[in-house]
Amino acid sequence: MSTGDRRVCLLTGAGGTLGDAFCRAYAASYDIVAVCRRRAPGVPSQHEWFVDPLDPDAAIPDNEARVFVVYADLEKQGEVERVVDIALARFDDVDLLVNNAAYTFLHPQGVVDGDVVLDSVERHFAVNVAIPLRLATRLAQRSWLHRDLRNRERNRNVVNVSSLSASRVYPGGQAVYASSKAALNHLTRHLAAEFGEFGVRVNALAPNTFPSIVSTETVADAIVRLDAESVTGRVLVVDADAAAEAAS
């Protein structure tokens, strides 16, 4: 069960830069299922329990703000379903799905530099498009479908972490990565139309490079902003000259 009135968040890529920042900033606000491939976020999890040796019965704040870590390789068959089942078994429901896990392979020499770029296409689209689709679909099938009123009451939604490169051309060999994120943006719009039928919103977040151009904390805050709003089918841009602006 969730803790009190806190929302339940299923977060992928929890051990990365953004996932870690989100857990650090919002572990006290959300019950977070932190999905990691290898490295867990740097916050207390169900694997730790803190005790004051001078007062063993004292309440320790870190014990109330723990994340529930799940190690999974979402590229392997059946792992998405396992993660969804674990999240629902632990908390009964999920209010917010954050598809943050991503694959990035840049090719500064261009797409014609041998076969290395072509060989990366399948994995880019598998991780950046197919896995978010599968997670959202399985969660809808196993929890959200036919629960329109409850979904609207809880303002349930999906946030897909995309990239500003999905709509702009940057140097550095981002052609395949950017194309996969552009596909994620359009997938977001289609899912918003379909999931709206049972009261679930779907949006995407398109940050510039973090933390070098935009602070990671700003991007994490933008996820929470989308969670709190009522908008659906939109891409929220997070750039240095505009902390968060809507983009169609």
Please tell me what each predicted stretch does.
Residues 100-108:
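Conserved NAD(P)H cofactor-binding loop of Rossmann-fold oxidoreductase domains
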Residues 83, 98, 135-139, 143, ...:
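Hydrophobic positions on the long internal alpha-helix
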Residues 15:
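Conserved glycine-rich cofactor-binding loop
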Residues 29-52:
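Conserved glycine-rich Rossmann-like NAD(P)H-binding loop of the short-chain dehydrogenase/reductase
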